[in-house]
Regions:
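N-terminal transmembrane-helix/juxtamembrane module of multi-pass inner/ER membrane proteins
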Residues: 1-25, 38, 55-81
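Membrane-embedded catalytic cores of phosphoryl/pyrophosphoryl-handling enzymes
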Residues: 71-164
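Membrane-water interface at transmembrane helix exits
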Residues: 29, 54, 58-63, 98, ...
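Short helix-capping/hinge motifs at transmembrane helix termini and TM-loop junctions
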Residues: 32, 62-63, 122-123
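Hydrophobic, aromatic-rich alpha-helical transmembrane segments
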Residues: 7, 36-41, 123, 127
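Interfacial segments of alpha-helical transmembrane regions
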Residues: 29-52
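Alpha-helical transmembrane segments of multi-pass membrane proteins
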Residues: 47-59, 112-118, 141
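Core segments of transmembrane alpha-helices
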Residues: 17-26, 86-94
Length: 164
């Protein structure tokens, strides 16, 4: 039987949807300046790479069943439970954006944590699935930072193109 959902788990169910991260990216790209657009680009690239690594490379290699109770409220996913692809891509997006806009690290990480907690509470994933997904996301963002260092624009400076 699925566990009773708390307010955090309910919020997490909303936050675990990829369109939410697309909305965050859209607002940053439209309302922000050069740094925000750079953050969206970095976060988006990290998101796509982590999703590929978790869902296309690793999931087919690991045959892990979903936790008991998975799919009671809807159809059970047919892919392996390990690792959590949502967690991998969400974490990569958050860590990627935070490299360019460090002030967004805490609110984005809080939203992602709520989403990942709901994956556990709703019996969609084991704790280790979510931890592994987070590690993949962090690893992708780390490799991206080393291969494509963030561009630092001093506060108040106008970057090329007129944005900040």
């Amino acid at each position: 039987m699925a566990t009773r959902l708390t307010w955090l788990a309910r919020a997490g169910r909303i936050l675990e949807r990829p369109p939410l991260w697309g909305a965050v990216a859209t607002v940053l790209a439209v309302k922000g300046g050069t740094r925000s657009r750079q953050a969206v680009l970095r976060g988006g690239v990290c998101y796509l790479i982590a999703a590929f690594v978790a869902n296309i490379v690793i999931k087919p290699l690991v045959d892990r069943r979903r936790p008991p109770g998975a799919g009671e409220d809807r159809i059970t996913p047919y892919t392996s439970s390990f690792p959590s692809g949502h967690t991998a891509s969400d974490s990569a997006f958050v860590f990627g954006v935070a490299q360019e806009l460090p002030l967004l690290a805490i609110p984005l990480a809080a939203a992602a944590t709520a989403a990942h907690w709901s994956l556990i509470r709703s019996d969609k994933h084991h704790v280790s699935d979510v931890l592994a997904g987070g590690a993949i996301g962090l690893g992708v963002a780390y490799i991206m930072r080393k291969s494509w260092p963030p561009r630092r624009v001093p506060r108040g400076a106008v970057a090329p193109g007129g944005g900040r």
